[in-house]
From Swiss-Prot:
It comes from the Bacteria. Transmembrane segments: none annotated. Heterotrimer of alpha, beta and gamma subunits. Residues 1-25 form the signal peptide. This is Dimethylsulfide dehydrogenase subunit gamma. NCBIfam families: DMSO_red_II_gam. GO terms for molecular function: heme binding; metal ion binding. Heme b binds at H81, M147.
Length: 265
């Protein structure tokens, strides 16, 4: 089986110097995780051909140890609807989201991780589920990062929630216009890691989609840079709908691929 042996050798070489992925939430503030400011540009790392995740969206695959992590500050979204204003509280804490962006010749990947002391899996009468999303401008950064500008300047949103470990591809042209798209090409998987204490527990989520886009409002990756933004929902804090944590303005994902670091570098 020479082909299989070649893939094993290529994977081993790619991962030869990979550090172990940290389990502690303290690593969210580690010195090697650079804080990204709004409107900064970050690379989408190219995973070499012949290197594969163990499963299509494996959150714990060692390949992620070769992809740089970036830290994004998340703050409470301003209330954009009276119903959100009624639930809004200034004391909601800010928090960090750690982001990794990667691609192969066929797929685009995003990996997110964040501290969450509680694993909130579903929405019931007085309980709410956790969630995370990445938002893509369908054109450029003139589009509002707060759910799009209008029907002519929309955004594509990948929304993950743990109820069934599902990812949905959505579109919006303004707050309150969120629509589930007919085509659902985005897939994902998650892992909840329990640490030594509540502040050491975290969600890790991977979402991905084929690079080729089919259907209306599915983001095109055939661009040098793509404006992206992020959102989190902490179910234990009764966050849902527009009551959420968001990144401040767009961050630019550079699709002109940077190769993953070679072993020994």
């Amino acid at each position: 089986m020479p082909g299989f042996r070649f893939l094993l050798a290529a994977t081993a070489a790619f991962l030869a110097t990979s550090p172990a992925l940290p389990l502690s939430a303290d690593s969210l503030n580690a010195g090697n995780i650079r804080l990204v400011d709004p409107e900064e540009t970050v690379p989408v790392i190219k995973i070499p051909d012949g290197i594969y995740l163990r499963t299509p969206n494996d959150p714990d695959d060692i390949i992620w140890a070769r992809v740089p992590e970036f830290r994004v500050e998340m703050v409470m979204a301003p209330p954009v609807h009276p119903s959100v204003g009624l639930r809004y509280r200034d004391e909601y804490p800010e928090q960090d989201l750690v982001v990794q962006l990667a691609r192969t010749s066929e797929r685009f990947y995003v990996r997110l991780r964040w501290v969450d002391p509680t694993r909130d899996m579903s929405t019931l009468r007085d309980r709410f589920r956790d969630g995370a999303a990445i938002e893509f401008s369908e054109s450029d950064d003139s589009v509002s990062y707060m759910m799009g500008t209008d029907a002519e300047s929309p955004v594509n949103i990948w929304y993950w929630h743990p109820d069934g470990d599902r990812v949905e591809s959505l579109a919006a042209g303004s707050p309150g216009s969120l629509t589930r798209l007919d085509r659902q090409p985005v897939t994902g998987a998650s892992e909840y890691r329990t640490g030594h204490g509540p502040d050491d527990s975290q969600w890790i989520v991977v979402m991905s989609r084929p690079l080729a886009s089919e259907g209306d409002h599915q983001v095109s990756f055939e661009r040098d840079t793509i404006p992206v933004a992020f959102a989190l929902w902490q179910g234990a804090d009764a966050q849902r709908d527009g009551l959420k944590l968001v990144s401040l303005n767009w961050i630019f994902a550079r699709m002109t691929p940077d190769a993953a670091p070679a072993p020994g570098n």
